[in-house]
Amino acid sequence: MKVLLANPRGFCAGVDRAIEIVKRTIDMLGTPIYVRHEVVHNRFVVDDLKQRGAIFVEELHQVPDGATVIFSAHGVSQAVRRQAAQRGLKVFDATCPLVTKVHLDVARHCRTGRDMILIGHAGHPEVEGTMGQWDQERGTGRIYLVENIDDVATLHVAQPHHLAYTTQTTLSVDDTRNIIDALRQRFPTIQGPKNNDICYATQNRQDAVRELARECDLVLVVGSPNSSNSNRLSELAQREGVASYLIDSAAEIDPAWVIDKHHIGVTAGASAPQVLVDGVLARLYELGATSVSEHSGKPESMVFALPKALRLQLVD
């Protein structure tokens, strides 16, 4: 039984930045430090940060007045930002810069009075934050959420000829392409972003798992169940005709999965650390793996800067 590792896999620049913001804020200010929502969607990472003193909450009313709060990599609405300011909270923003780019795009269309369509998953924190960039007081248009092609077919917008779209950054590239095609067919004058809003890390990891699936009869994706991009990786492998399972750690591997399997692919979502992948490899060796090789993949060199206050602390 041979194991093939996808490349790239695991942490992206936005996740690296978000985790580092929490760690450095704790080092700089001490505990408690509050984090609104899981800073990234990975149980192992969140548990580690809890042990360091981070307190995770879902809403700002759970944060004491004047305390320090970190916004997660998924971003927050303008209403949350206003609430934090009104309560005198010290804020460090771990929103991924690629999510911020989408937020700025939504705000720009709002100012022009254009209607806006967001392609995304209802209830996902990134979607809630992006929808919350729409300021009815500063624009006359509306924002709509579509999750699939069926939503496009039944969508009624107020301004079909004054319309734009954007996307959640962690969606399936293939699914998003199909939805965009449906939008363009129904609304021929709709405007889109200059560049695809699916983030570079999402696309690279999906390309890598597609290549992996061509050579394997089983693909294991390391990632937590609430990780959007990790779920898309497992779904993509399945669409390529390969059995695939999303696992939080090596402990979730069922030995029955690897019976009569000759090539097992392993990848990890953008919020899953390499230590979890290492654990999966060790478990596969126990189950009979004879070798591990790694695809060359697409190199990633993206690095996002920390907030200025944390950079200054490093210099000091």
Swiss-Prot record:
Database matches in Gene3D superfamilies: 3.40.50.11270, 4-hydroxy-3-methylbut-2-enyl diphosphate reductase, catalytic domain
* GO terms (BP aspect): dimethylallyl diphosphate biosynthetic process; isopentenyl diphosphate biosynthetic process, methylerythritol 4-phosphate pathway; terpenoid biosynthetic process
- Please give one Pfam family short name: LYTB
**Residues reported to bind isopentenyl diphosphate:** 41, 74, 124, 227-229, 271
Q: Which domain of life is it from?
A: Bacteria
Cofactor binding note from Swiss-Prot or TrEMBL:
Binds 1 [4Fe-4S] cluster per subunit.
Which reactions is this enzyme annotated as catalysing?
isopentenyl diphosphate + 2 oxidized [2Fe-2S]-[ferredoxin] + H2O = (2E)-4-hydroxy-3-methylbut-2-enyl diphosphate + 2 reduced [2Fe-2S]-[ferredoxin] + 2 H(+); dimethylallyl diphosphate + 2 oxidized [2Fe-2S]-[ferredoxin] + H2O = (2E)-4-hydroxy-3-methylbut-2-enyl diphosphate + 2 reduced [2Fe-2S]-[ferredoxin] + 2 H(+)
Question: What's a single GO MF annotation on this record?
Answer: 4-hydroxy-3-methylbut-2-enyl diphosphate reductase activity
Catalytic site: 126
- Amino-acid positions noted as binding [4Fe-4S] cluster in the UniProt annotation, renumbered to this chain: 12, 96, 199
Locate the residues binding (2E)-4-hydroxy-3-methylbut-2-enyl diphosphate.
Answer: 41, 74, 124, 169, 227-229, 271
Annotated positions binding dimethylallyl diphosphate: 41, 74, 124, 227-229, 271
E.C. code: 1.17.7.4
Pathway given in the UniProt record:
Isoprenoid biosynthesis; dimethylallyl diphosphate biosynthesis; dimethylallyl diphosphate from (2E)-4-hydroxy-3-methylbutenyl diphosphate: step 1/1; Isoprenoid biosynthesis; isopentenyl diphosphate biosynthesis via DXP pathway; isopentenyl diphosphate from 1-deoxy-D-xylulose 5-phosphate: step 6/6
Q: Which UniProt keywords apply?
A: 4Fe-4S, Iron, Iron-sulfur, Isoprene biosynthesis, Metal-binding, Oxidoreductase
Cofactors needed by this protein, per the record, are: [4Fe-4S] cluster
Function according to Swiss-Prot or TrEMBL: Catalyzes the conversion of 1-hydroxy-2-methyl-2-(E)-butenyl 4-diphosphate (HMBPP) into a mixture of isopentenyl diphosphate (IPP) and dimethylallyl diphosphate (DMAPP). Acts in the terminal step of the DOXP/MEP pathway for isoprenoid precursor biosynthesis.
Entry's family note: Belongs to the IspH family.
* Protein name (database record): 4-hydroxy-3-methylbut-2-enyl diphosphate reductase
- The gene from which this protein is expressed is ispH
